[in-house]
């Protein structure tokens, strides 16, 4: 049976519409709290959020839910998703919660859950929590209701942890860095960490007002960052998304560097230092075939998973890899973090930039990607991928791309979208096949 609330990255949707209502958020708090109340000790949950307007409402609803079943709440305020994961483990909490819709606009919000080890919950845990949402709740006795308090030291603790991932013998002195925080969760901690390491810093996207998160800024819209890098003659530009678990880089010439290129860079660097485990990296089916070929030339493998950084992390843990990620900019380095951390990843890139002495435009473009095209088709309902004409269009494209490329068609786990991606050596064929499938999906939807 399909899950009603949880998608590929927790629960997400438009605020004040199911499942992102205060009522459901309170029930999630109760259900998750009940699921993680184990033993006789006092239970705690760490809660962070990004800067969107609805964060206050969702935070209050979750606190009501958790405290009603006897869990104490540690409130971090606006903090990156990886900070919540790190502090959940550091504070020995039973559960961590991030209130964010990541790269989505302010009208959406979401709930991501982390276990006491700082890793995102498994499908089994999420399914168990979802099952509890439909059952009666056992509330705590009056004397056992949980308490809530805010922790003011959270920012400093996270900045310290992030900086510890940067080589001690290096500094960023003399490096002109433009950072775009997307008016999101990292608007304070990211500039602070870079400044403390000595960077000549130019900050953008650091004035959140509740509705401007990810609005023409951040990792999903780098145009302003590209312009600023060129205008200021910066050495590099850093773009984070709303909850700072993604990283996209802009080189000194204003060109965008995606997650595939960044994974190639950090993997080769780690391999050279003897620090790469697993004999390669983990990425999703969306990563470019050029990355796979490049790694093979270095004697390294690419292990692919379905889309979602949590599935990347699960494969990394199961197979013994320590570097993985997604083309979209989730870069996971389990030597430093339990989930994608845009700031940690940025520091690893900056470390290699400083050590190499090369300009970013020369260092960061590790391989020539194959022509790749991704288009999204919005649909109102139903199952357009089961339509006969859509199935036929996909089969035709697969046949024509056999041996020279790949085709990935999937339903988004966070939005009502069908994502159509094709790549291959023939750019015109790739474009034609994507358009062919998108047209069929639109007619079916």
UniProtKB/Swiss-Prot annotation:
Co-factor requirement: Mg(2+)
Major enzyme class: isomerase
Binding site for Mg(2+): 102, 241, 243, 245
GO MF: magnesium ion binding; phosphoglucosamine mutase activity; phosphomannomutase activity
Catalytic activity from the UniProt record: alpha-D-glucosamine 1-phosphate = D-glucosamine 6-phosphate
GO cellular component annotations of the record: cytosol
InterPro entries, sorted: A-D-PHexomutase_a/b/a-I (IPR005844), A-D-PHexomutase_a/b/a-I/II/III (IPR016055), A-D-PHexomutase_a/b/a-II (IPR005845), A-D-PHexomutase_a/b/a-III (IPR005846), A-D-PHexomutase_C (IPR005843), A-D-PHexomutase_C_sf (IPR036900), Alpha-D-phosphohexomutase_SF (IPR005841), GlmM_bact (IPR006352)
Database matches in Gene3D superfamilies: Alpha-D-Glucose-1,6-Bisphosphate, subunit A, domain 3 (3.40.120.10), Alpha-D-phosphohexomutase, C-terminal domain (3.30.310.50)
Cofactor: record remark: Binds 1 Mg(2+) ion per subunit.
Similarity comment text for this entry: Belongs to the phosphohexose mutase family.
Family annotation (HAMAP family): GlmM_B
Role summary: Catalyzes the conversion of glucosamine-6-phosphate to glucosamine-1-phosphate.
Protein name as catalogued: Phosphoglucosamine mutase
């Amino acid at each position: 049976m399909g899950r009603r609330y949880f998608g590929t990255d927790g629960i997400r949707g438009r605020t004040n519409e199911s499942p992102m209502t205060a009522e459901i958020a309170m029930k999630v708090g109760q259900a998750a709290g009940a699921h993680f109340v184990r033993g006789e000790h006092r239970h705690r949950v760490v809660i962070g959020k990004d800067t969107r307007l609805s964060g206050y409402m969702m935070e209050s609803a979750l606190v009501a839910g958790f405290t009603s079943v006897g869990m104490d709440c540690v409130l971090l305020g606006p903090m990156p998703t990886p900070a919540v994961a790190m502090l959940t483990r550091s504070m020995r909490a039973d559960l961590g919660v991030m209130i964010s819709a990541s790269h989505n606009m302010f009208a959406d919000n979401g709930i991501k859950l982390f276990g006491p080890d700082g890793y995102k919950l498994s499908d089994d845990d999420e399914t168990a929590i979802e099952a509890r949402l439909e059952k009666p709740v056992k509330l705590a006795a009056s004397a056992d209701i949980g308490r809530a308090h805010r922790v003011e030291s959270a920012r400093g603790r996270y900045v310290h942890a992030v900086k510890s991932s940067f080589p001690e013998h290096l500094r960023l002195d003399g490096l002109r860095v433009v950072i775009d925080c997307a008016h999101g969760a990292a608007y304070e901690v990211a500039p602070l960490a870079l400044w403390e390491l000595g960077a000549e810093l130019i900050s953008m996207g650091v004035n959140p007002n509740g509705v401007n998160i990810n609005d023409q800024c951040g990792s999903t819209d780098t145009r302003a960052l590209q312009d600023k890098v060129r205008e200021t003659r910066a050495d590099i530009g850093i773009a984070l998304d709303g909850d700072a678990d993604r990283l996209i880089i802009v080189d000194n010439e204003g060109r965008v560097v995606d997650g595939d290129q960044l994974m190639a860079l950090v993997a080769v660097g780690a391999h050279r230092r003897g620090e790469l485990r697993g004999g390669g990296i983990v990425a999703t089916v969306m990563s470019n075939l050029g990355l796979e070929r490049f790694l093979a030339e270095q004697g390294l493998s690419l292990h692919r998973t379905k889309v979602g950084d949590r599935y990347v992390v699960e494969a990394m843990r199961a197979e013994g890899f320590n570097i993985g990620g997604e083309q979209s900019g989730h870069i996971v380095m389990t030597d430093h973090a339990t989930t994608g951390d845009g700031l940690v990843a940025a520091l690893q890139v900056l470390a290699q930039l400083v050590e190499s002495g090369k300009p970013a435009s020369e260092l960061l473009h590790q391989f020539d990607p194959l022509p790749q095209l991704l288009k999204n088709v919005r649909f109102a309902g139903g199952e357009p991928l089961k339509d006969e004409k859509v199935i036929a269009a996909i089969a035709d494209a697969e046949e024509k791309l056999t041996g020279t490329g790949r085709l990935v068609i999937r339903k988004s786990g966070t939005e009502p979208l069908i994502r159509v991606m094709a790549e291959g050596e023939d750019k015109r064929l790739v474009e034609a096949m994507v358009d062919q499938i998108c047209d069929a999906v639109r007619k079916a939807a």
